[in-house]
Regions:
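Short juxta-domain linker segments that transition from a proline/glycine-rich
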Residues: 1-237
C-alpha cells in the first residue's frame, strides 16, 4: 500500500525517500510507522488517511474521459489533475443541487447538438447564445482583453469558468500545461470549465472555445492539446 501511494503521487521510491527518509525503514520492515507518522505520510502523497488501512489499493477510475493529442484516451492522469477534477465535481454537485432545489430551469444549450457534429452550426449557435458578433475578438488590443470579454459573456449564460494552474491554492502542486490545458464538466444546470492559467493567453482562448463546443455537444472531457491540436477522436473532431 505504501509503494502504491508513492507511485500514485507521481514519485518513485528513491526520489520520495530523499524527501521522507523514514519510508525506507518502513518498506524494509525495520520499523513500523506510528499513526502520527502515517498521517504525515498521507499528506505528503495527497492520499486520504483512511486509504492506508485498506487491504489493497482501491480501483480509481478517471472521473471523465481524458483525450491525448496522439489519438488515445488516457487511462491515467497525474494526481494533481485528478484531485482538481474531483474538487470541481464536488463544487458542481453542490451548485447543481442548489439550483434544482430553488427551481432554476436547466440550461437549454447544454447537449443541444448531442447527435450532431456540424462544426459551423455549433459555432454559430454558440456565438448566438453568447451574443457575440463575427470577428468580435478583433476589436480588442490584447488576448487578455478579448478573454475577459468572452468569459463575461460565458458566465452570464450560467457557465462557471475557473482559471488556475495549481491544485486549489497549493503552490506546491502545479498542474503541468503539457498534461492538462483544461477540462470541462458538462451538466445541464451547472456546467464547469477549467482552464490552466499557466498557459499562454492565446492557448487559453483555444481551450475555452473547445470546451464550449463540448458543452454544446454534451460531453465532459479533459485535454492536453499538445501543439494545440485536438485529439484524433470522433468526439474531438
Amino acid at each position: 500500500m505504501l509503494t502504491w501511494a508513492i507511485t500514485r503521487a507521481g514519485y518513485d521510491v528513491p526520489a520520495f525517500a530523499k524527501k521522507f527518509p523514514k519510508i525506507l525503514e518502513w518498506l524494509e520492515g525495520q520499523k513500523k510507522p506510528t499513526v502520527k507518522q502515517l498521517e504525515e505520510f498521507s499528506k505528503k502523497v495527497y492520499l486520504p488517511f483512511g486509504y492506508l488501512f485498506l487491504p489493497q489499493p482501491p480501483q480509481e477510475k478517471l472521473p471523465i474521459p481524458f483525450f491525448r493529442t496522439n489519438g488515445n484516451q488516457a487511462d491515467k492522469i497525474g494526481i494533481n489533475v485528478y484531485d482538481t477534477i474531483l474538487l470541481l465535481q464536488r463544487r458542481q454537485d453542490w451548485l447543481k443541487n442548489y439550483l434544482k432545489d430553488n427551481d432554476f430551469p436547466p440550461l437549454p444549450y447544454v447537449g443541444k447538438f448531442h447527435n450532431r457534429n456540424n462544426v459551423k452550426e455549433i459555432v454559430a449557435d454558440i456565438r448566438q447564445t453568447l451574443q457575440l458578433p463575427e470577428n468580435w475578438a478583433s476589436h480588442f488590443k490584447t488576448w487578455q482583453e478579448a478573454q475577459d470579454h468572452l468569459v463575461l459573456h460565458i458566465e452570464d449564460k450560467g457557465i462557471i469558468t475557473i482559471f488556475n494552474g495549481i491544485v486549489e491554492n497549493n503552490t506546491h502542486r502545479p498542474i503541468p500545461v503539457d498534461e492538462c490545458r483544461g477540462f470541462v464538466l458538462v451538466d445541464e444546470y451547472a456546467p464547469f470549465m477549467f482552464v490552466n492559467n499557466s498557459d499562454f493567453k492565446s492557448a487559453q482562448m483555444f481551450t475555452i472555445v473547445h470546451e464550449l463546443a463540448h458543452i454544446w455537444t454534451g460531453h465532459s472531457a479533459g485535454f492536453d492539446f499538445r501543439r494545440l491540436q485536438p485529439a484524433n477522436d470522433p468526439i474531438e473532431i
